């Protein structure tokens, strides 16, 4: 898993898998999900990031559960 924050673009990209992205879907304004050939989620893009979280925060806790 890779996380990239682009402050200039005001966006965050979370890459869950390195497989080829076949389809993207905006599921909520500014939230885009990327899917591979098996329709599995492989990436999450969050636009207008600074309006959603405080970018000056030094630590951000994220809980990830696998099903």
Where are these regions (language model features)?
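Small, basic N-terminal interaction modules of short regulatory proteins
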Residues: 1-67
């Amino acid at each position: 898993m890779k996380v990239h924050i682009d402050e200039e673009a005001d966006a965050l990209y979370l890459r869950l898998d390195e497989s080829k992205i076949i389809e993207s879907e905006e599921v909520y304004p500014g939230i885009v999900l990327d899917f591979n050939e098996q329709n599995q989620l492989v990436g999450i893009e969050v636009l207008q990031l600074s309006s959603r979280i405080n970018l000056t925060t030094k630590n951000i806790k994220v809980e990830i559960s696998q099903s």
